[in-house]
Amino acid sequence: MGEYARSLAIATGAAARWPNSSIRFMLSREAPYAARAPFPATLLASSPTHHSAAVIELIEEWRPDVVIFDNAGRTAQLRAARRCGAAVVYISARRRQRRKAFRLRWLGLIDEHWIAYPEFIAGSLSVFERFKLRIRRRPRVRYLDVILAGDRDSKPDLILDRVGLAAQGYVLIVPGGGTGHPGGEATVAHFCAAARDLAAAGFDGVFVGPIQPEADPHRRLRAFGTVPQSELAQLMRGARLVIANGGSTLLQAIACGKPCIAVPIAGDQRERILRCVNAGVAMGAAPDAASILRAATTLLADRGSLDALAGRASDLGLTDGIEVALRAIDGLIAANCG
């Protein structure tokens, strides 16, 4: 999940939990989502990481209780937040940012370090990381596991009625954007072809992605450019099988207890997929239409394997990262007020 989508999910949860709270984003005005951000936003010429003066000025003027740096941030920005009395949260989504958060000078600036994946994906704290935490006695480290918008107990009936499908009767195909990764667009096209071929083979499907499959003469395939995260979660819960990239979409499907086929659209996803395959919660497929189709038809023909994948996914017990974040924020605000 991208930094903005993750932060937006947390902010939306915070606004629902604390209706009187004030929430503000700092975004690049060049980002495609900047113009439609649902919260007040300060727009900068590029990533806020590169505009420390503007970030520091806003922190000093606004004086927030909590500042969240999602996979970005400069030392001067963190220091400004601490100087103004704010609790500082840093979210790391990659190894480089995780190493950055464990630098000794940053350990003294961060109150909470949230790792943006489950422990079995991101890895347990190393001996050296634990040693540093013992020395500095901070920050608190948490794994967000998975960001899954919407009520976990909600039923998918509404959106399924809209698309004319029955629960457990369709395959959900979600390639992700792919546009930010070399070769990503080509892989998304392979997802499209596989979705079309599955429909031709007699399987109902829902495709959610930026490239739309060719018209399905059998009308078994429903295609959407985008859907809200809450509706995507409902589609996952109602699916018989989910075919996804190796990013956050895969983890969301696993958290829903669904059998998954994972296809990498970026280099860093291969290791993530391998960890899921080794944990028995996903099946991998090469990023080409024939391999995706073969994996899907093989799995769909084997009810025992489908059920086994779903069972292991449910047993993994991934926690709701939004709830983890909100509990942490509540504790930080209580500590600051105390």
Q: For each of these PLM feature ranges, what is it?
A:
Residues 1-17, 24-133:
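Active-site and donor-binding regions of nucleotide-sugar-utilizing enzymes
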Residues 42-50, 222-227, 282-288:
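Short acidic-hydrophobic, aromatic-tinged amphipathic segments that line or gate anion-handling sites
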Residues 109-177, 210:
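A nucleotide-sugar donor-handling region in carbohydrate enzymes
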Residues 161-238:
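Donor-nucleotide binding loops and adjacent catalytic segments primarily
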Residues 237-247:
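Acidic donor-binding loop of glycosyltransferase active sites
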Residues 250-294:
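Catalytic binding pocket for nucleotide-activated donors in carbohydrate/polymer assembly enzymes
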Residues 283, 289-290, 295-314, 335-336:
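Conserved donor-nucleotide binding/catalytic region of nucleotide-linked donor-dependent transferases
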Residues 318-338:
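C-terminal alpha-helical cap of glycosyltransferases
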